[in-house]
Structures are given as structure tokens and as C-alpha cells.
Amino acid sequence: MVKLMIRRLSSQVSKFVQPRLLETGTLRIALINCPNELSFCCERGFSAFSDRNLSYRERLRSGLVDIKADDAIDLFRDMIHSRPLPTVIDFSRLFSAIAKTKQYDLVLALCKQMELKGIAHNLYTLSIMINCFCRCRKLCLAFSAMGKIIKLGYEPNTITFSTLINGLCLEGRVSEALELVDRMVEMGHKPDLITINTLVNGLCLSGKEAEAMLLIDKMVEYGCQPNAVTYGPVLNVMCKSGQTALAMELLRKMEERNIKLDAVKYSIIIDGLCKHGSLDNAFNLFNEMEMKGITTNIITYNILIGGFCNAGRWDDGAKLLRDMIKRKINPNVVTFSVLIDSFVKEGKLREAEELHKEMIHRGIAPDTITYTSLIDGFCKENHLDKANQMVDLMVSKGCDPNIRTFNILINGYCKANRIDDGLELFRKMSLRGVVADTVTYNTLIQGFCELGKLNVAKELFQEMVSRKVPPNIVTYKILLDGLCDNGESEKALEIFEKIEKSKMELDIGIYNIIIHGMCNASKVDDAWDLFCSLPLKGVKPGVKTYNIMIGGLCKKGPLSEAELLFRKMEEDGHAPDGWTYNILIRAHLGDGDATKSVKLIEELKRCGFSVDASTIKMVIDMLSDGRLKKSFLDMLS
């Protein structure tokens, strides 16, 4: 396709600038097309160039860094009104400066105006246009501009080709970019390092790191030595996809090719190793950096500290903090936030508070993440008043609570049986512009279900759906469990049938809830049918599923059916647990078969389990009314 476009470039020259270019510009850009409005604009001053007596050439030399749109238009206006007219070289300087500020539409609009003034493009201005077209995702126009280059008799250079190649890569059209490289070589242009780096980056963005490596190796064969920039995208993709072993191999290959490695490349691999659980390897690589004289920075330390903390090795994370302070590398808010969060998760709230004080002492302002972690710690310790004080503090410091902050507080209220306070906070949340998410609704629905306030729970669920907050599998588990536990199994089955017909992937947990609900509602036969259908649905029953079904069969009777399933679960590779044995022991005791219960107790003990509180209570009750002999109690010890 690209080859065909290259061959047709010359025929497309007349259409290379479309009138619609100006449609994407600002009002100021649109005024350039209107002479009367332009005359009015001539009267106004401009911010960056206050000296009206400065010539446009002096301004071109002195003030084009980070040029603003209004200033660029003012300068362009002065240039087109100068006599004699400036050369195309002068205009190219202005266009280049504007392009560096990423105001690509403005460049294209001004190029059009220059052309209308009779100033012909040169290779440089057309190359700038190609870059702007590519950045604006207007590749057809970029190729048309290339056609104009060829028609005017200019020889496209490597930079021009590289710009087009980059444009194709930006749109994910890497195969076409590779074709253009072939065409470029046919025209006698050797791809340079910029071209290769562009292609490697494009291949990596498309998830084709293997092809990127082949391209690099081919490049070495042609005598073009890759640099650290070339390998960066490949290392990044490898580490993100968990291919840390390959990333390490590539690191060694880079060393063999005498490519200077820096902290950035090492940090990429260290980050990948941390995220995929290879903390010791990450720490070894960190030490290797030190031995090779590669200076570690705050980013490297933060990655490692985060890795250790996420793995629960907060002590190692704290050691690294002390080490970096000793090396005069100042920790930042990320460093402290990671450690504070880790201490909170480990239940070490006091240490987290000490770290908070330390960061304040060092003049480091906590952010929303820091405050939210501390609020989480207070909620876990049931210090809700302190949690609210922390919210007030963060707001006073200009940190807005986010949805996670509110979710933590609402969960804290629910755990403390202050669900009405949680609901009130939920209502106030929207006044702060914070939109509730699935976690928010799940927390409140669960809280009201546990209190038996099903009407409120159902209203919240309906509100959730109407506000287009997507319920997830956890939402349905909470709701179905609440309905079943509160005697509304029919409603639970109705909802279950709907989600079974949906595309949501259901796990064994949700089937356990429904089977248990059916058994409690004396629909054991229906529960059995659903249990037997699980393999056909591609769902494997677990030990808990068997226990629920055995319990249901025990309630329905006869016990022989429960015994058969008990033996079958072992045949199916599911070893019974203490709950399985206790269910059967109580069932046989209730049926008056103490002998069978004794055998099951002996088997239970051999398997390393013990009699639970429910079984002990049943035995004591039966002893007290004479249904069991006192000697039976000795069996339980």
C-alpha cells in the first residue's frame, strides 16, 4: 500500500493542502483567512514582543522558545506585511518553533497562508508540514506533501522518511512503515538510528517485541550500532509482559555490545522483577548497579521499596528508606506513601503515624494516597473519629478525598454497625463531585443485607443499575446471599436466572450460594439438579459445594444419599474437611445412630480434624435429656 502511495505521490500534489485544514484551528487561526479581521488584529499589541520597533528577523532570533499561538500569529502577520517579503527560510524558522510547542494545526494554517502570499515551499517547510500532518493523524495529507517534495525536484532525505515512518507507527501501521523503509533503501537512503528507533518503538507498541529484536540484530549486521534508546521499548514490553528472564538476557547482550546502561534501563527491569515476585533478583540487580558505578535515584529506590512493601516485607522497605537517606537521596511523597500503606496493611498503625510525622518534619506534603492509607488504618482499628479528623485535615491542606477514601470510610462505618452514618456519607459524597463506584454500592448493599434490611439493599441495587454503575460478580454474591439468608430464596432464584442468561462469567462461589439457599428453602431436589449440572456448565464443585449438598441431603433424608455423596466426593478427588464430618456426625446423632457417629468421630480424628462447637452443643443437649450416655462425651476429647 505504501509503495503504491509513494508511486502516486506526484499525481496527488495539487490536493496536498485542503481548505478544511483551518476547520480544526482556533478562532485566531480562522481570522487569518479574513483580511478585514486581520486588519483589526493588526491594531492590537502582543505579549511576548513588546518592542514594536524590533524587526521580524530580530524577533526570529530572540524569542521563539515556547512561543504562544497569539504571538506566533502576530509575528507571522508582521512578516507577511513586510516589504520585501521574508524568505521561506525565515518562515521555516517560525514554523519549526511553533511545531516544537505541538501547535500542529496552527503550523499547517500558517503554511497555507504563506503559500497564498506566493511564497514557495522548500524541502524544510514541506518536511515540517509532513511532521505536523503525521502528528495530527492525517497521513494521506502527509504523503501528498511528500509528493509535492518530489514534484518540486527536491530529494527526500532520511529525516523526511523517518517522519512518515513515525506517522505510520503512531497509527499502528507498522507493516506499512517497514514497507516504506524498503522503498527508502531502494531510493538510495540508508536508515539511520532515528529511523530504526522509531520502528522498534512502533513494533513494541504493537506487541511485536520479537520482531523488534530481529530488526535490531539485522541493524547490527548492516553496521548500524543500536543505542540505549533502541533497547528501551523492548525492555519495557518484556518486563510488562512478565518476560523478565528475556529482559535480563537482553541486558547482558547490551553490555556485550558496549552500550552504556543507565539507571533508567536497570529500573525498568527491577520494576518488572518486583511486579512478578522476583524480589531477591531485583535486589541483586540493584546491588549490581552500585558495583558498576551506576548511580541509583529516587525512582529506583521507590520501585524497590514498593516491591518489598507489596510483598509484605515492610522491614526491608524501611531499611531501604534508611539507606537512601544515608546516601543523601531525599525520599519523596511516593516513598513515604508506599511505606505508610504497607505499615497500615500489616496492622502497624503506630509506625505509619510516625512515618507521617517524619515526612511532615522533612517538609514533604502528604497527598491523597498518603491520607487515604492513614484513614484506612484508623478505620481498621475502629477509630472512626480519628479517621474523620484525618479527612478534615486533608481537605484543609488542599487534598480532595477520592472514591477510595470514601469507600474506606463507608466500609469502616458498616463494620462498626454504623451503617446509617455510612449511607449519610454516601449521600454527601456526590455533593463533593465524587461518583460512587461498584465497590461503594457493594459495601452498602452488604451492610444492609447483614442487618436484614433487604428493602434498602434492593433499593440501592436498583439505584446502582439506574446510574449505570456496573454490578460485578461480588455484587450478585452479596445480594443473593442476603436474599437467601433472609428467606427470599424465590427472589434470589429470579435474579440468578437473569445473570445465568447474561454474559457474566459465574464462578463456583455464586452456585454455592444458590444451592445453599435452595437447601434452606427445602428445595433439595432442585439443589441436587443444579449440583449435578455444574460439570456441564464448565464449573467444578469444590469441597464447600459438596458440604452444602451433603447438608441438604441430611436434612431431607434418607441419610444413605448423603453417605453416598460423602464417599463420591473422595472418589472425585475432594478430600472431606472437618465441616463435612461434623455435618454427618450431627445428622446421625439426630437420627439416633450413635454407633455411626462414633465411627465418623474416629475417622475425623485420624484425618487431623476436631469436633466443632455445634456438634459439642448437640451432644451436651442430648446428654442432658438422656438420649446419649455420658461415656459418649469422652469420645469428643
Swiss-Prot record:
Q: PPR repeats located where?
A: 87-121, 122-156, 157-191, 192-226, 227-261, 262-296, 297-331, 332-366, 367-401, 402-436, 437-471, 472-506, 507-541, 542-576, 577-611
Coiled-coil spans are none
Q: Which GO terms describe its molecular function?
A: RNA binding
InterPro entries associated with the record: Mito_RNA-Proc/Resp, Pentatricopeptide_rpt, TPR-like_helical_dom_sf
Q: Tell me which Gene3D superfamilies the record gives.
A: Tetratricopeptide repeat domain (1.25.40.10)
Record key words, sorted:
Mitochondrion, Repeat, Transit peptide
Mostly located where?
mitochondrion
**Record's GO cellular component terms:** mitochondrion
Q: Where in the cell is it found?
A: Mitochondrion
- The UniProt annotation puts the transit peptide over 1-95
Q: Which GO terms describe its biological process?
A: mitochondrial mRNA processing
Q: Spell out the family assignment given in the record's similarity comment.
A: Belongs to the PPR family. P subfamily.
For this protein, the record's NCBIfam families field holds: PPR
- UniProt protein name: Pentatricopeptide repeat-containing protein At1g12300, mitochondrial
Q: Which organism is it from?
A: Arabidopsis thaliana
- Lineage of the source organism? Eukaryota, Viridiplantae, Streptophyta, Embryophyta, Tracheophyta
